[in-house]
């Protein structure tokens, strides 16, 4: 259903019993959507992901179907999701390229919520937890996005940073420790921000070509950019 940041969702026993990292929601009580979002982003709360999934779609399975449909709309062609938390399952998978597309979509489509990813800590029920993203604690322009870890996949991270109005999204995965994840992601972000530049190929409202028109009033029509074309 439609939710707002102020909406309150009931915590099911399934969510409360969920293993792994937790936000520590309490079974039978309600939690605010904004708190749950922060619990997922900052605290890596597997329990919070299930509360949100059930609130949005009724069940976690139904949410996974919605998730797969949405993933396809943003070009994630080699991913399949069967749960909300990323809990290990042979049918739950993605690729570095797809995860980079997800990161870019988060930044582009939901700028009003992206600031949550830069929060270094969050307190819920008097329990304060630090953000696990190591990039946030290094002065290299990072402002997100999300860590991940399972025994099968190793330590991973979708990271992002901005410098001189130029944004970089990076993905690392399969690293053998949190320390290795921190070092490799930091190295990649610093390198990318120093060694790549944005180039403007066409300014907004520029005529870039003429297209032939068949049986029209004019023989050609101008192709004009709506916005700056950069890469």
What positions do the PLM features span?
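Active-site-adjacent loops and short helices of periplasmic peptidoglycan-processing enzymes
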Residues: 1-97, 104-108
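Domain-terminus/edge residues, biased toward the C-terminal soluble/receptor-binding domains
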Residues: 76-80, 88-93, 97-231
């Amino acid at each position: 259903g439609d939710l707002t940041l102020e909406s309150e969702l009931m915590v099911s026993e399934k969510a409360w019993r969920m293993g792994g990292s937790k936000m520590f929601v309490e079974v039978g009580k309600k939690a605010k959507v904004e708190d749950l979002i922060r619990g997922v982003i900052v605290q890596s709360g597997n329990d919070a992901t299930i509360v949100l999934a059930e609130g949005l779609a009724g069940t976690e399975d139904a949410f996974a179907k919605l998730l797969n449909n949405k993933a396809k709309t943003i070009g994630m062609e080699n991913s399949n999701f069967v749960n909300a938390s990323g809990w290990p399952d042979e049918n739950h998978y993605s690729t570095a390229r797809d995860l980079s597309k997800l990161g870019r979509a988060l930044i582009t489509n939901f700028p009003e919520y992206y600031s949550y990813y830069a929060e270094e800590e969050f307190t819920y029920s008097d329990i304060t937890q630090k953000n696990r993203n190591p990039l946030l604690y290094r002065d290299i322009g990072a402002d997100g996005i999300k860590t991940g870890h399972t025994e099968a996949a190793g330590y991973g991270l979708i990271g992002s940073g901005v410098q001189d109005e130029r944004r970089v999204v990076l993905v690392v995965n399969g690293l053998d420790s949190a320390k290795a994840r921190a070092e490799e992601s930091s190295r990649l972000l610093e390198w990318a921000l120093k060694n790549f530049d944005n180039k403007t190929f066409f300014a907004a409202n520029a005529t870039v070509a003429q297209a032939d028109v068949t049986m029209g009033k004019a023989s050609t029509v101008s192709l004009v950019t709506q916005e700056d074309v950069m890469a």
